[in-house]
């Protein structure tokens, strides 16, 4: 067992009893990356997350490990080069959560992308991002473009470009990084909120006071250094520190909608112009659905649950019907949706899409280190930068010496599959192995492709599972038990949203099996009646919010 919910009390005891080199506030991809880098260098690491891991921005993205093509349009050449390098590393270290996918870029008369400039742009992108030969761009005429995706608007079509993006499961990427950090010695816990900082006699930060959001217990965590990696909450967290700088975040909201392929039979991922504002958005097929996004609007409301409002849904439906006019989707065709908040660094006078996605590290007089901004793709490099600085400070202030960054070739949990080139072969081997556990081929394939080298753990659970009396199918029961024992799942929403993505891509499973899942969790985790009622209600609210056009203004009223 690694990140086991069943070991929660022991983890809390370790957090109370030990002094750490660093405690990290925030369990999204940024915090997870820092925990992995620091623990791999030999540092004693603690991490707390007030909600579930990846519950903020890190489960609400476009679910792409970008190569950074959009930054080329803004002539951010260095960003494209670094993003391309990092994308290759992310893929190599975790091919079970990252998949190369051909993206079609249709070009229309009067659109933002001309054929000549697109060809040059994609060629530059291939070079800067270090794209593998087999994945380099190809230019297409109108006929070839329609062969790739017949639903694309024919009127004014000049041709298209085809290039490769990498599709990911952002929340699973985060949890796999977190699990590897724990294997390297980090003590990590979710549903635990940092309430305030503690200071030594020289007014230097020397830890945090936390509150368990499940039991309401409060306790201190002692650490030589504190890193604030709380994403959209960065400003709130450091407002509790007396020594903050005058920089601040500007939040923008991005919304995605999900439509069944029976209504929107998209065969190919497409990156396309919108009619209204000239922005570009994605339409991506996944697991029998097509998801479309994203919007980009300023946001200053509830950060814990940003919602897709009717205006967001209308914008995306209009965009689909503009680029795919034969489809005729309507609001009632939306099965599910999600909204995320981007924690960008404020740049006065810029539109949401113009604000840089770069990250910055801020150091307060108290010694508090804060990391702000950044992108999913760059998580490893962001961690490298801040842990280099942390290492420097631990040496100068405490005389401690640590190794250099060693995450470039470090697989994440589940990533020990013999490299990305071997992943397909690995899956076939696992499917064969599963026969000895009496597991059918499609279940075995699902476990192997989703959990990588951890698949055998699921095979073992499935082999002895007494699942029939629970009313759950074998795959859902197995994943539920695995996620409680290894991925710190405590609430039904943790399981249905962030460990499995079912609320977005298989909402029927949530609707059909929610009561049975809650019953199994109540039995395994010892829910009180009050907890069971609260978590049932919380899940129903999440379902309602995903399915409907919510009234949520951009700014609190």
Swiss-Prot record:
FAD binds at residues 21-49. InterPro entries: DAO_C, DAO_C_sf, FAD-dep_OxRdtase, FAD/NAD-bd_sf, G3P_DH_FAD-dep. Pfam families: DAO, DAO_C. It comes from Staphylococcus saprophyticus subsp. saprophyticus (strain ATCC 15305 / DSM 20229 / NCIMB 8711 / NCTC 7292 / S-41). Belongs to the FAD-dependent glycerol-3-phosphate dehydrogenase family. It is found in: Cytoplasm. It catalyses: a quinone + sn-glycerol 3-phosphate = dihydroxyacetone phosphate + a quinol. SUPFAM superfamilies: FAD-linked reductases, C-terminal domain, FAD/NAD(P)-binding domain. The keyword Oxidoreductase applies. GO terms for biological process: glycerol catabolic process; glycerol-3-phosphate catabolic process. GO terms for molecular function: glycerol-3-phosphate dehydrogenase (quinone) activity. This is Aerobic glycerol-3-phosphate dehydrogenase. It is an enzyme of class 1 (oxidoreductase). GO terms for cellular component: cytoplasm. PROSITE patterns: FAD_G3PDH_1, FAD_G3PDH_2. Pathway: Polyol metabolism; glycerol degradation via glycerol kinase pathway; glycerone phosphate from sn-glycerol 3-phosphate (aerobic route): step 1/1. Its EC number is 1.1.5.3.
């Amino acid at each position: 067992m690694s990140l086991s919910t069943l070991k929660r009390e022991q983890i809390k005891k370790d957090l109370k009893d030990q002094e750490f080199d660093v405690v990290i506030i925030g369990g999204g991809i940024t915090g997870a990356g820092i925990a992995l880098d620091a623990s791999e260098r030999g540092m004693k690491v603690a991490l707390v997350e007030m909600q579930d891991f990846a519950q903020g921005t890190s489960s609400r993205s476009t679910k792409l490990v970008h190569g950074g093509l959009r930054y080329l349009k803004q002539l951010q050449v260095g960003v494209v080069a670094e993003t391309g390098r990092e994308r290759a590393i992310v893929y190599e270290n975790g091919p079970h959560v990252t998949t190369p996918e051909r993206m079609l870029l249709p070009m229309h008369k009067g659109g933002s992308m001309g054929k000549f400039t697109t060809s040059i742009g994609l060629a530059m992108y291939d070079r800067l991002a270090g794209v593998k030969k087999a994945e380099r761009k190809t230019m297409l005429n109108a006929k070839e473009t329609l062969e790739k995706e017949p639903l694309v608007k024919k009127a004014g079509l000049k041709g298209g470009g085809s290039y490769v993006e990498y599709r990911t499961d952002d929340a699973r990427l985060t949890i796999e990084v977190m699990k590897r950090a724990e294997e390297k010695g980090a003590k990590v816990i979710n549903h635990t909120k940092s309430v305030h900082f503690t200071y030594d006699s020289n007014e230097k930060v020397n830890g945090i006071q936390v509150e368990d959001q499940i039991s309401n217990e409060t306790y201190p965590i002692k650490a030589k250094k504190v890193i604030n990696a709380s994403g959209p909450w960065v400003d709130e967290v450091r407002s509790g520190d007396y020594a903050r700088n005058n920089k601040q975040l500007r939040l923008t909201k991005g919304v995605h909608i999900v439509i069944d392929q029976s209504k929107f039979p998209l065969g190919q991922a497409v990156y396309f112009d919108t009619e209204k504002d000239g922005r570009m958005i994605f339409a991506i097929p996944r697991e029998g659905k097509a998801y479309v996004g994203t919007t980009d609007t300023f946001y200053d409301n509830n950060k814990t649950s940003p919602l897709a409002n009717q205006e967001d849904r209308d914008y995306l439906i209009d965009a689909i019907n503009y680029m795919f006019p034969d489809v005729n989707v309507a609001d009632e065709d939306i099965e599910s949706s999600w909204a995320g908040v981007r924690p960008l660094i404020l740049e006065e006078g810029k539109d949401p899409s113009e604000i840089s996605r770069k990250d910055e590290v801020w150091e307060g007089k108290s010694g508090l280190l804060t990391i702000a901004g950044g992108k999913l793709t760059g998580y490893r490099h962001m961690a490298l930068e801040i842990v280099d600085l942390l290492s420097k400070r631990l040496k100068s202030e405490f005389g401690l010496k640590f190794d250099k960054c060693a995450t470039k070739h470090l697989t994440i949990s589940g990533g020990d599959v013999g490299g990305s080139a071997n992943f397909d072969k690995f899956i076939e081997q696992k499917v064969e192995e599963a026969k000895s556990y009496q597991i059918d081929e499609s279940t075995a394939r699902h476990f192997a492709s989703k959990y990588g080298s951890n698949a055998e753990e699921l095979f073992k659970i499935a082999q002895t599972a007494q699942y029939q009396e629970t009313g759950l199918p074998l795959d859902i029961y197995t994943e539920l038990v695995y996620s409680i024992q290894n991925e710190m799942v405590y609430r039904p929403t943790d399981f249905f949203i962030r460990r499995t993505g079912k609320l977005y891509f298989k909402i029927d499973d949530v609707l059909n099996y929610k009561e049975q899942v809650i019953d199994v969790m109540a039995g395994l985790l010892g829910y009180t009646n009050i907890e069971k009622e609260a978590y049932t209600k919380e899940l129903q609210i999440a379902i309602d919010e995903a399915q409907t056009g919510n009234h949520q203004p951009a700014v609190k009223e």
